[in-house]
Structures are given as structure tokens and as C-alpha cells.
Amino acid sequence: MSRHRKPARGLADRLVTAGLELVLTAGALVLLFVVYQAYVTDWFADQRQDQVAEDLRDEWQDGPPAEPALGEAFLFLHIPRFGDDWNRAVLEGVDPDELSTGPGHYPDSALPGEIGNFALAGHRVGLGSPFLDNDKLGPGDPVVVETADTWFVYRVTGSEIVDPTDTSVVDYPLAGEREGAWLTMTTCHPKFSNRERLVTHALLDSAVAKADEPQGPALLAAGE
């Protein structure tokens, strides 16, 4: 009898061991994916972001910019809450190609300073993670948009969590809000998930010509 039990126990042990190995392998693969998504894609996106930012600055030196085409950078976004040197070049379009380089502008939404809803999208984690800390923005926080000739200062009014299919957040007028020049930023929520969308709204507070303030509003240097 004992000679028949030992093989049974050995088979059970092998099955348990194989199961544990599968679990460990799956865990390692998940960890590698997280590292790749959070760090490796960030590195590549940062290289692309640096290049388009440099190209945009050079373009502005050459003369008045043309109407942006899909995939082209056409302005800079500054968010002092993330650091006084935090800025990202924003591209026209919100397809994967654009968002793999930086924040993108919803093509059918308003432009900076216009009455309407100037709407942007950006990744939360990975591919540059431009909107990683958007959940830290609160009412009154400034969001500065830099174009070739103007600085626009928006002030955050609030945020909301919505379903990914809710596109009304980038429409105009915004539900329950007064008319004006609005800025909306959308990103995934929570971190490491695209189950929902974190939406941040801001209202235009002021605008100043770059000819009058070449270095930008004082709040940029102050890191307000």
C-alpha cells in the first residue's frame, strides 16, 4: 500500500510546485510590465518631448507660426504646482501617436484664450506621464498656457471623475458652469488604470502679451 501512496504524494507535490512556479512567473511578468509602462516608456516619451519642444522654440524664432497640423506641437503648458520648471509641449491631436509624445489638444475644441472649452488629454502613468499628479491640483491653482505671442493664465475651478465614454466634459458650455474661456484636462483614473477619467477644469484669469512679459507671469518664477 505504501508503495502506491508515495507516487500520489509526489504527483501532488509536483503539481503544487508547478502551480507556484506559474504564479511566480505571472507575478514577475506583471512586475516587468509595470516597470516597462511606468519607466521605460517614460524615457522614450521624454526624448520625443525634448525634441518637439526644441523644434517648437526654433520655429517661433523663425517667425509667426502656421496653423498647427495634426501631430505638431504648437504651445507649452506650465503647471507651477508640479514645479517652477515643469512644462510640456502640447501637440495637436489626441490619438496614440500624439499622446506618446506629450499632452494633446482635442482638435474640435477651442484654442487658448477663446470663449469655449480648450481641452487637453494626457497620459497619467507611462508615455511621459504628463498628468501623473493632476489629482493634486485644487481650486485656484494656476495653469499657464504659452503660445508664440501670449501667456494665458487659467485658474483651476475643480475636478470630477467620469466614465471614459463621457465626452461631454470636453464640450461647451460645460454643464452647470458659466460661459467663458475654459481649459479642461483629461487623464486616466486611478493611476495604473483606465477604468475612469480624471477631469480638471480651469477658467481663464488673465492674459498678457509676451512682448510685455518675455519671461512669463511672475507666478511661474514663484512656483505658485
Across the structure, where does each feature detected by a protein language model lie?
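Solvent-exposed, non-transmembrane regions of membrane-associated and secreted proteins
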Residues: 11-12, 17-18, 23-224
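N-terminal Lys/Arg-rich, disordered targeting/topogenic segments
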Residues: 1-12
